[in-house]
Structure formats: structure tokens, C-alpha cells
Amino acid sequence: MYRFTTATKKLLGDLHTPVSLYLKLRDVYPQSALLESSDYHGGENSLSFIAFRPVARIGVNNGEALLEYPDGRSVAKPLGETYAAADALKEFLNEFRVDGDGSELCGLFGYTAFDAVRYFENIPVREFHHRDSDAPDICYILYKFLLVFDHFKNELSIVELCADGERDHIREVETLIEDRNFASYNFRTVGERRSNLTDETYREMVRQGVRHCLRGDVMLCKKFRCIGFAVNGAHADY
């Protein structure tokens, strides 16, 4: 089991916004995550999170679970009747214990994609994998650092996971927060737009969705298609 103890510090939170700090952190710490709250008026649901510097992760894709641990150990396990996605997630979670102030905030950050329904229900999903952007169906990451904004109290908390005998790096993070400079990139598209469906095929999908709604099969039906193009810049500047 991997054991961590938290190191924490609270700062005034009215001098920064989640987006402004994320723009500072994204270049220093790749794979940072931002979860921003839009409710600043009450004590509930008033927290925003920035998580950075991954230490462990679990991903599920192509019928396989990949578990990556803080010591560099990596385990790939095929999913089936005797070992499901839920078993992989439970196994991964049981490998960690976090104690200390703010430990209740130190969960996993990630996503479960729509296509992951096939790992939990007997619903067939057509496989579609793009060689340039084959994101996992399920991906959750344990991060070393969290910045927690309490918009109701105007507080900013730094939470760090420290292994046994490891000194904290709170001061280094605080210095980065106080830095007034961050990179800015102009966003622009390059070349022609690409899609996996033609315009007419997509229109027919929409017409089919309208027919299902009118017939009463569903109350809401959303139709999507993949659109891609080369870009210069960063996604946060879009």
C-alpha cells in the first residue's frame, strides 16, 4: 500500500482566479486538470480545483485496464467476466491511503466516457479508435498537488501529498502562485477541417433523432460527430 500524509497551507483567495492560476501551471506541470465551480453564492458547491503533477493513474481502453503506481510499477490486466472495470478501479483505490488535514479532498480526478457503459452494462458499443487521439474510455489520476478555491470564503488552499520521509514543497508552489508572469499563446486553426462524417450523413442523423423524439422514444437526443483540424496555440486560449 502507498501511504501519504498531507501538507497544507491556506492563502487569501481573492487575488487569483482558477483560470489565471491554471495558465501559470499548465506549462510547468503538463497534464494539469482544472475543475471550476460556477456557483459562488452559497457554501455548497463553491469549490474549484486545480490538480497537477500526476503520481498514479488508472486507464481503461480496448478491453484492458492499465494501472500505474508512484514507484513506476505498471500493471496491465485484460477485462472479462472474472475481472471487470469496477474490480480494477477498486484494486487501484485500495492501494492508497491518505491521512492529514485536507485528506478528504485528495481523491482521483478524471472522467468516465460515454462509451465506457459497455464495461458496466450489457450494451454493445462500436469500437472506434483514432491513432492520433485514442483517449481511454476511463481515466483517473491521483495528483501530488491540489489548489482548492473556496469561493464562498475567498480562501485558497494548497494541499500536497507527501510520502514517508519526504519534505513538503509548499513554498515552491506558493512562489509559483505569486509569479505575475505566465505564457500566453495566440490560438488559430491551420489547414482544412476534417470530420469522420459528411455533412449530409450528419444531417440524416439529426433527422433520425427528430423522428425518435416525435415518436416518443426519447425526450432528448444529441447527435455528435468528430471534427478535427491542426492548430497553433493552446486549448485554454481558444
Question: Residue spans of the language-model regions?
Answer:
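Extended alpha-helical targeting/anchoring segments
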Residues: 1-238
